[in-house]
UniProtKB/Swiss-Prot annotation:
Gene3D superfamilies: 3.30.70.240, Elongation factor 4, C-terminal domain (3.30.70.2570), Elongation Factor G (Translational Gtpase), domain 3 (3.30.70.870), P-loop containing nucleotide triphosphate hydrolases (3.40.50.300), Translation factors (2.40.30.10). Pfam families: EFG_C, GTP_EFTU, LepA_C. InterPro entries: EF-4, EFG_III/V, EFG_V-like, G_TR_CS, LepA_C_sf, LepA_CTD, LepA_IV, P-loop_NTPase. GO terms for cellular component: plasma membrane. This is Elongation factor 4. The keyword Membrane applies. Belongs to the TRAFAC class translation factor GTPase superfamily. Classic translation factor GTPase family. LepA subfamily. Its EC number is 3.6.5.n1. PROSITE patterns: G_TR_1, G_TR_2. GTP binds at residues 29-34, 145-148.
Length: 617
């Protein structure tokens, strides 16, 4: 029952034995945020009249797309057998781009609720997050959600879940986040089954940052889980990775609105406000300690967020460049994984090369720039970072085709990923064919049940950042799901394909591609530009080249005036003279003429990824 009417445990004076830290892990769309809503309601921290769907998803984009991007932490009281417990629920993102955030959120917990949609079953990202939870030695409570749906098959999927984590299908809880059925039983089970946090209250303070958000009025709000010792307001604290020191202006818990407290003790989850304005000073995974009595060792598992996908962002209107720069700076306050640097393109003008965690991250960032800052942007095709070694042993890191070195190249290394694909078994052939065509190497295959297969492949990252997810969805009729993680790099036979108009290179259309696919890219791009560039007074050749070797060509025919219109009958030599004269003029025009590529052609040619990105939700 909810103890809101009685005494709820007070932050900073809570015995670790009555604290339970847990998170909910699930694939996108399996009802994680809806279940969180019901928990908030049943524990009484949000009144029914204040309730709104997906209460914890604060960003417009999160609400519209129905995805969780930023983690949230909420403290909820719950009473079992006459004892009041403090439950800390850490809501995690479900998408593959945000795996590091999920891993830090899991490290802040002792247990996880593994949520599976009773109508869809286990999906790739459920598995990936489950393995992360197992690596962190979390106690796992299996739960089937959406059992009120007519299409639900609880018996079938309860067996799948039991096979996966070991146990009995009858132990799998059945709940409905929508109607609230089974939620109270789940809350009781969390209290009974999950272990209490362990830590030394007298040791130097150590707290792990699992998220940080930028608040316009208060600066950076850092969410932490205290492992050892205590943190009090007005203390000086230190971040152990950057050695930066701050004064702790406010400390408290989210319940779910921020509530200041007298401090945070062992096992507690809460927020810190230091008045700092830059999220990069509060890095996810870092350890916070007390400056007066610092800890000697930081908590394990910290890693810097590393961008995987790079894309050029250019404003359609060149005068918007300063606005774009300010907008990116502001977004960086809230998103420590975003990196950018200015770049120029002869065709597109001034812009930025921006690094992202993955395609969803790219799409969300771009959408936020367009929506919150009213910018019209062109984004170039997404690239990955290549490591090019020249024959003189120099190493160049390339994120943009225009930086690709022209000298003698000894080898090129490209990033690899290990991908896990889950799908019904009738699609195995189609999936293997797709992965083979993307230079994939099969790693193994397991049957989760008689009709669901887990297929593992090692693929180049460049092959999956463009349209892989889309094609996978269409080949599996929407039933396939994908999860991937970085897996080193390997040597590859890559070349740079240049597109030339009238013999002049257009940098915006260049691409780094595998030698086997260079011809296909050249033919596709020249064909597309032929359709998009308006006809000129003279013939315009469009060529694709690798170095100095032309691999594909299309021509835009010249517009000709009918110079013979005024000749009624008459001698053929008269007509020939007029045609020769026209030909001379066209030749002269071709020598001095320049082709202006209209903005629309750039947008159409570069947004081949638009339709493809739409499915990556």
């Amino acid at each position: 029952m909810s103890p809101m009417a009685r005494t709820a445990p007070v932050p900073a004076a809570t015995d670790p034995a009555i604290i339970r830290n847990f998170c909910i892990i699930a694939h996108i769309d399996h009802g994680k945020s809806t279940l969180a809503d019901r928990m908030l309601q049943y524990t009484g921290v949000v009144q029914s009249r204040d309730m709104k769907a997906q209460y914890l998803d604060r960003m417009d984009i999160e609400r519209e797309r129905g995805i969780t991007i930023k983690s949230q932490a909420v403290r909820m009281p719950w009473e079992v057998d006459g004892t009041s417990y403090a439950l800390n629920m850490i809501d995690t993102p479900g998408h593959v781009d945000f795996t590091y955030e999920v891993s830090r959120s899991l490290a802040a917990c002792e247990g996880a609720v593994l949520l599976v949609d009773a109508a869809q079953g286990i999906e790739a990202q459920t598995l990936a997050n489950l393995y992360l939870a197992m690596e962190n030695n979390l106690t796992i409570i299996p739960v089937l959600n959406k059992i009120d749906l007519p299409a639900a098959q609880p018996e079938k999927y309860a067996e799948e879940l039991a096979n996966l984590i070991g146990g009995d299908p009858d132990e799998v809880l059945r709940v409905s986040g929508k109607t609230g059925m089974g939620v109270e039983v789940l809350l009781d089970k969390i209290v009974r089954d999950l272990p209490a946090p362990v830590g030394d209250p007298d040791a130097p303070a150590r707290a792990m940052i699992f998220d940080s958000v930028y608040d316009t009025y208060r600066g950076v709000v850092t969410y932490v889980r205290v492992v050892d010792g205590m943190l009090h307001p007005r203390e000086r604290i230190q971040m152990m990775s950057t050695r930066a020191t701050h004064e702790l202006l406010e400390i408290g818990v989210s319940s779910p609105e921020p509530t200041p407290s007298k401090g945070l003790g062992v096992g507690e989850v809460g927020y810190l406000i230091t008045g700092v304005k830059d999220v990069r000073l509060s890095k996810v995974g870092d350890t916070v300690t007390n400056l007066a009595k610092p800890a000697s060792q930081s908590l394990p598992g910290y890693a810097d967020a590393k961008p995987m996908v790079f894309s050029g962002l250019y404003p359609l209107d060149g005068t918007d460049y300063p606005v774009l720069r300010d907008a990116l700076e502001k977004l960086m306050l809230n998103d420590a994984a975003l990196v950018y640097q200015p770049e120029t393109s002869a065709a597109l003008g001034f812009g930025f090369r921006v690094g992202f965690l993955g395609l969803l991250h790219l799409e969300i960032t771009r959408e936020r720039l367009e929506r919150e800052y009213k910018l019209d942007l062109i984004s170039t095709a997404p690239n990955v970072e290549y490591e090019v070694t020249l024959e003189d042993k120099r190493v160049v890191h390339v994120t943009n085709p225009s930086e690709y070195p022209t000298g003698k190249i000894a080898e090129v290394r490209e990033p690899m990923v290990s991908a896990t694909i889950l799908a019904p078994n009738e699609f195995v052939g189609a999936i293997m064919e797709l992965c083979q065509s993307r230079r994939g190497v099969m790693g193994g295959m397991d049957y989760l049940s008689e009709d669901r297969v887990e297929i593992r492949y090692r693929l180049p990252l460049a092959e999956i950042v463009f349209d892989f997810f889309d094609i996978l969805k269409s080949k599996t009729r929407g039933y396939g799901s994908l999860d991937w993680k970085a897996d080193g790099d390997q040597v590859a036979d890559l070349v740079k394909v240049d597109i030339m108009l009238q013999g002049e290179q257009v940098d915006a259309f260049s691409a780094i591609t595998h030698r086997d696919k260079a011809y296909a890219y050249g033919v596709m791009m020249t064909g597309k530009l032929r359709e998009l560039i308006p006809r000129q007074q003279f013939e315009v050749p469009i060529q694709a080249a690798i170095g100095s070797r032309i691999i594909a060509r299309e021509s835009i025919r010249a517009i000709r005036k009918d110079v013979l219109a005024k000749c009624y009958g008459g001698d053929i030599t008269r007509k020939r003279k007029l045609l020769e004269k026209q030909k001379e003029g066209k030749k002269r025009m071709k020598m001095v003429g320049r082709v202006e590529v209209p903005q629309e052609a750039f947008i159409a040619a570069l947004t081949t990824d638009e339709s493809k990105d739409k499915a990556k939700k």
